Amino acid sequence: MFRGSTQLNLDSKGRLAIPAKYRNELFANCGGNIVVTADPSRCLLIYPQPVWEPIEKKLSGFSSFNPQIRSLQRLIIGNACDVEMDGSGRILISAPLRQFAGLQKEVVLAGQGEKFELWDMAKWDLEIDTATACKDGDIPPELEGFSL
């Protein structure tokens, strides 16, 4: 289970050092085999390969005759990259994915349960500002009655 956010730096080659607290779990659960893909929010999604596979299968199974579904398939599956964590716990983020998400040197790795989101730090700050600006009436019906 991945939770919390960590401020990190991409190195000059576009590699991301996965925080030590997650490395053992990733090596144990997926042998360090990871999938990185684009998200419509202009961040990147990072999945352990076994978590990604049923998502890809389900998304691929939807009809591509629906233009919205086809666009999502192109974005998410079409940009998916298999990467392997090296012995130092680093993964290479491809140049096209870095460009898509606007990643500069300073990034935020945000745990989201079974996956991570990778954000440019400035975009992450804006995302958090937007989330904290929500009014009580803005809560989706699915969360009504949910208490923290």
Swiss-Prot record:
It is found in: Cytoplasm, Nucleoid. Residues 5-51, 80-123 form the SpoVT-AbrB domain. InterPro entries: MraZ, MraZ_C, MraZ_dom, MraZ_N, MraZ_sf, SpoVT-AbrB_dom, SpoVT-AbrB_sf. GO terms for molecular function: DNA-binding transcription factor activity; transcription cis-regulatory region binding. Pfam families: MraZ. The keyword tRNA processing does not apply. Keywords: Cytoplasm, DNA-binding, Repeat, Transcription, Transcription regulation. HAMAP family: MraZ. Forms oligomers. Belongs to the MraZ family. This is Transcriptional regulator MraZ. It comes from Nitrosomonas eutropha (strain DSM 101675 / C91 / Nm57).
